[in-house]
Swiss-Prot record:
GO terms for cellular component: cytosol. Catalyzes the attachment of glutamate to tRNA(Glu) in a two-step reaction: glutamate is first activated by ATP to form Glu-AMP and then transferred to the acceptor end of tRNA(Glu). This is Glutamate--tRNA ligase. Coiled coil: none annotated. A motif ('HIGH' region) lies at residues 11-21. The gene is gltX.
Amino acid sequence: MTQRVRTRFAPSPTGFIHLGNIRSALYPWAFARRMKGDFILRIEDTDVERSSQEAVDVILESMAWLEMDIDEGPFYQMQRMDRYREVVAQMVESGLAYRCYMSTEELDALREAQRERGEKPRYNGFWRPEPGKVLPEPPAGVDPVIRFKNPIGGSVVWDDAVKGRIEISNDELDDLVIARPDGTPTYNFCVVVDDLDMKITHVIRGDDHVNNTPRQINIIRALGGTPPVYAHLPTVLNEQGEKMSKRHGAMAVTGYRDEGYLPEAVLNYLARLGWAHGDAEIFSREQFVEWFDLEHLGKSPAQYNPEKLAWLNNHYIKVGDNQRLATLTQPFIEALGGKVEGADLAGVVALVKDRANTLKEVAQAALLFYRGEPQADAALKAEHLTPEIQPALAALANQLAALPEWKREAISATFKAVLAEFGLKMPKLAMPVRLLVAGQLQTPGIDAVLELFGRDTVLRRLAAAA
């Protein structure tokens, strides 16, 4: 019987979560969904001083925005301390781990001497019990660390789904501290216990964890478990080619939402930031899940390209449902001081969205419909609202008032009739109408703009020219 796939995302809540971080959630989420398995969220909050509930909330908010649903969790490592201590005690009792009384000063001196000899700094196994070895009496008043008895000789070998076969000699690994003098377990140990208890089958994470993997595999095997499949993802680089980080200017995932990016655009972009399905650039969430596999994960670092993300966001705005976009755009309009009333916002969005890369830009383009009475520049009025144009404006207003239906086509036909009657070119009439109705010279098509403003508003504002 095939084992059910179980993946996990295990962030540390020590800062905001950026695109590079959330990609490490997207791929295990997609793999679990593709394989009809389970996706678990685990919060690795053992760094008590740096961890915060605010950071946890941002992680949950970011995942919810991208619709990365979880099947189990969130589990918090700080709430599992009793379990970790239980396993540490079992390992000491069974001889898999031991108490080490070497002080920090002694360890520092040992490492310095090793460096001077050109050796790799490492613990020398002084307190490691072996058959026939006589250990000194533990020093009084010293709380020991607990070290894992790493295998001597041989190698740790695993077939990484991204990096291929990796082999590390056990001689390169010293006996890892799994519990500190105060009894608190260490990171690598907690990860192993969690992965075993949660029956994780695939660990898809950043390649900054590669060096932890041989240590974790040895502990897993010592505890009688089977190591999961590992897939270590190459780093995500920023525009300057540096590792993406807050220090180097990375923006929080929620920042993209607040700037007016759509979740489907960000998800589509993230999916391609280290994985490919042929030449497919644009695909839905459902297609991504259907296509996702570990075999096509990239082996080289992926570089963030804001222009590509903006292009994708523009695509999703252009093809997006106008009513949904209107709902998402309204807060941006209100943030600009607009009051959404009168013109149908879904219709306005449909009119202005094609050139917008973000919902903020949609809102800026839509604002002319929602900022109250137009305040056109006096110089522009003097230039365009000349005595010569007044008869044509009056005729236009009269004919618009008589329209049986306030539709774009009828408005356009009315303009053409007035232009023909007075022998005018479109700009000569459209410019003053734009100033009077919208308060600016640049707008989308005048017939569409007037239709959205509505008959009453248009006629009232045109009357101001009289």
